[in-house]
Amino acid sequence: MQTTNAFNDNFVKFILIPLGVGLASIGFAPEGLEYLLGLLLVLPFVFLAPSAGWLADRFPKNLIIRWSSWFQLAVLVLMSFGLWIGVSSEGNGGGVALPLVIFAFFLLAVQSALLSPAKMGVVKELLGSSRLGFANGLMEGTAILAILLGQIIGGIWFDKWGLQVGRGIWQAAFTPVLWILIGGVLSIFLSHAIEPTKAAGAEPFKKKIVMRHFVDLRIVRSDVAMWRSALGIAFFWGFGGFLQLLLIQIAQERKGSLAGMGVETAILWMPVVLGIVFGSLLASWICGRRNELGLVVVGGLLMSVATVLLAFLSSGISSYGLLAIAGCGGALFMVPLNAYLQDRAPESERGLVISASNLCNNLAGVFAVVAQMACKKSGMPAWIQFLVLGGLCAWVSLYLLRLLPKDFLRLVVLGVFRSIYRIRSVGHREIPSEGGVLLVANHLTYIDAFVLSASCPRPIRFLMFADCFENKWVGFGARLFDALPISSTRARDAIVSASEALKQGAVVCVFPEGQLSRTGGLSEIKRGYQMIAKKAGCPVIPAYMDGLWGSIWSFSE
């Protein structure tokens, strides 16, 4: 349902952009309609953010999705009527048709703004936390694919099957929008298939809700991690909005006229589509068991490198490859942040949090529209715009690397480990998604910590002798995995440290044998883990590793 909604909105947008350019070229419309449409698309998200968040918390989210689907169909009918007026009065530029069509487009943006918190918030209600990263990867991939396909198909339809077969400007826009009504009907059917959900129980509507933008933002800002996630997501949408307008500018410069502009824009967008789809699916696969925030750094680095190189390779086959890399990086950047924000938001305020995040996203979108328009009007070459955009991405990536060094290194280390060793885990879903958990595992090799970390859906903290921290490489790995230093002469302190970590909601692993196995079987089990579990009041889950005995990391030889 989200896919069809996104496709419909962007299909219409990229029908209206060349329509406006064509009308402006014959004096029946002002220039720069693409910037007006860009603003109209994001302004409802800004002004309606508190109301949309309240709506998603006050009523069952599946009902909000259903109502918005009917509203979208009604608006598409209104837009078709406006375009029909334009066809009927083509000789005088369409008369009142253009203002009516632009108003209908604005209503489509209103519909998307009211729908967004409900469609994002319903994911956790239907799937829970454990599959949130995976679901967000699929959702973001299909949604962005729909956005870009809508833009590509809309532009090609207007150009190839409209103008180039002899139809007038209005007729070239009217026919495809008429067909898109089918997508509106499909959205309604899909919305009725969503399972019923419960309302979060928000307060009754009050006038002050309409203008409480900064109150909702304060909810997000009260949690530093949640606020940084919202800013990161906003940066992605600002980056995407600027890049989109920059590619439209390049298409206009290459063609120099309306003819062929839609196709050229579609050609430039195609590698971005493929990159985002691949990146979203990759993020979904990597985050299948747990949300990997280290991907955010990887995505940011890919975005910055690709965008900087586009400044020097803005034409030819290599430029399309770089656009694909930028798209892939953008998906890897956004998917974990979206999943983290949804998971961290309190259930009773999830709609408000997502709505406040949308407010940030669209303020970034407004800034992107204004900034790119200023760059174009000032005559700034495209290559300099790419360079500035890439430099900004590089700065953000380095900042994220400072914030998330452990997540990034952990992702890289475990990624390399998984590529060398094939690991099959059974029963990992028995580990609770939150709260303290004590894992009790057998100890076969020096790499047991990596095996368990690669298998568990949650980060694990291991008990490790303090002397090990003094070794350069072992100490690095211990800090990377937030190991708890203990002393062999102060056993009581070790029990207290482990218990405190468990009370704080961590997953702690102990090897109760106290040493590596010398035979491949179990050694004597020490009782310290029982004292830890009793003191922390947490569940104990046994973990057994097999197939490692005989490796170079064991005492088999």
Spell out what each predicted region is.
Residues 1-16, 37-75, 100-159, 228, ...:
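Substrate-agnostic recognition of the 12-TM MFS/MFS-like secondary transporter fold
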Residues 15-26, 80-90, 147-180, 249, ...:
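Transmembrane alpha-helix termini and helix-breaking/packing motifs in multi-pass membrane transporters
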Residues 58-74, 285-302, 382:
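Cytoplasmic membrane-interface "Motif A"-like loop-to-helix N-cap segments
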Residues 419, 433-490, 496, 553:
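Catalytic core of membrane glycerolipid acyltransferases/transacylases, capturing the structured
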Residues 427, 503, 507, 518-557:
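A cross-family acyltransferase "interaction/gating" segment
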